[in-house]
C-alpha cells in the first residue's frame, strides 16, 4: 500500500479545501470523511448527497477508492464532487493509505 506521509500532503493539496477527516469534523463543500472505510456511498450523517451518490450502493474500501479517485464523475455519474481525479496510481495509493489512518483515529 501507499505512503501515509505522502498521502497526507496530497490530501492537504487536493482534498482539504472540501473535506475534513477528524472525528466530529464539520462538513464543508464535501462531507467529513471520518469512518469512511466500510461505509456505503452517500451515508455521512448530516450531509446532503446527490441521488447518484446515495444510489451507487458500494462500500468504501481500498479498491473502490482506488477506482473512484481516478475519475470520480466516471465512477459516480451525477456526483457533485468537482474534483477531476488523480491519474497516478501511486499517488492514489498514498492518499488511500493516509485516509485509512486519518479517518479511523
Curated annotation (Swiss-Prot):
GO terms for biological process: apoptotic process. Heme c binds at residues 15, 18-19, 81. The modification N6-acetyllysine is found at residues 73, 100. The modification N6-succinyllysine is found at residues 56, 73. GO terms for molecular function: electron transfer activity; heme binding; metal ion binding. PROSITE patterns: CYTC (PS51007). The modification Phosphotyrosine is found at residues 49, 98. Belongs to the cytochrome c family. This is Cytochrome c. It comes from Oryctolagus cuniculus (Rabbit). The gene is CYCS.
